[in-house]
UniProtKB/Swiss-Prot annotation:
Compartments (UniProt record): Cell membrane
Similarity comment text for this entry: Belongs to the CidB/LrgB family. LrgB subfamily.
Gene that this polypeptide is encoded by: lrgB
Primary location class: membrane
Xref: PANTHER family: PLASTIDAL GLYCOLATE_GLYCERATE TRANSLOCATOR 1, CHLOROPLASTIC (PTHR30249:SF0), PUTATIVE SEROTONIN TRANSPORTER (PTHR30249)
Function: Inhibits the expression or activity of extracellular murein hydrolases by interacting, possibly with LrgA, with the holin-like protein CidA. The LrgAB and CidA proteins may affect the proton motive force of the membrane. May be involved in programmed cell death (PCD), possibly triggering PCD in response to antibiotics and environmental stresses.
Protein name stated in the entry: Antiholin-like protein LrgB
Biological process according to GO: cytolysis; killing of cells of another organism; programmed cell death
CC terms in the record's Gene Ontology section: plasma membrane
Keywords linked to the UniProt accession: Cell membrane, Cytolysis, Membrane, Transmembrane, Transmembrane helix
Residue ranges crossing the lipid bilayer per the database entry: 5-25, 31-51, 61-81, 92-112, 149-169, 177-197, 209-229
Recorded topology in the membrane: Multi-pass membrane protein
């Protein structure tokens, strides 16, 4: 069992699971349940369970991949640079919309968790789900949450937005590209950005800035709820 403690174990499991997810997504005409992140998560959990491996054994290498999540978010700056003129022109409206959306997300999760009497650890795990994984996981751990539950919540949330985001926008007749991008990024994280890229450069840029600002707002807002949870 000592060999499974090397970093290669977690890295290889992660890459293979993600590779299978990418293959299934591509050959299923992008069926939303085969989103690579979701498939990788399900396969990874299944493999660890069937092989009777512990999370610690996996995470020896898994945390190396997690480390690169944070610098990878720098890539969001590319579409932002291309749409700098719109950011300067509508910066107040953009920031206001993202901040309100972020706070609403945290408040709704808090109210629902309280209403159904969720365990404190689970509640703390769910609160950061508004942020992207790179921010949500360390935040969850810092407030006494369970990162694994947080990861599931973030990814599941993003998959829903990836699958139904465009439909929701069409149903509610949201036609402004800036509004579309902000909605997708605020609700769907990186997968929301992916949908934005499919729609256009403006949507992609707005979704990218939403992911970044939501993370900052979540980090600031969630500690304010801690006295209410304790």
């Amino acid at each position: 069992m000592a060999s499974t403690m090397t970093p290669y174990f977690g890295i290889v499991v992660s890459l293979i699971a993600y590779g299978i997810g990418t293959f299934l997504f591509k050959h299923s005409k992008q069926f939303f349940l085969f989103t690579p992140l979701f498939v990788a998560m399900v396969l990874g959990i299944g493999f660890l369970k069937v092989g009777n491996f512990t999370f610690e054994e996996y995470n020896t290498g898994g945390k190396i991949i997690s480390f690169f999540l944070e610098p990878a978010t720098i890539a969001f700056a590319i579409p932002l640079y291309k749409q700098a003129d719109k950011l300067k022109k509508y910066w107040w409206q953009i920031l206001s919309a993202i901040i309100v959306g972020s706070i609403c997300s945290v408040v709704v999760v808090f109210i629902v968790a309280k209403a159904i009497h969720l365990d404190t650890a689970i509640m703390n795990s769910m609160l950061p789900q508004a942020a992207t994984t790179a921010i949500a996981l360390p935040l969850s751990e810092s407030i006494g949450g369970i990162p694994a539950i947080t990861s599931f919540a973030v990814i599941f949330n993003a998959v829903i937005v990836y699958a139904l985001g465009a439909l929701f926008l069409k149903t509610f007749r949201v036609k402004n590209p800036i509004a579309k991008g902000l909605a997708l990024g605020t609700a769907g994280h990186a997968l929301g950005v992916a949908v934005g890229i499919e729609m256009g450069e403006v949507e992609a840029a707005m979704a990218s800035i939403a992911v970044t600002v939501v993370g900052v707002v979540t980090v600031v807002v969630i500690p304010l709820f801690m006295p209410l949870i304790a």
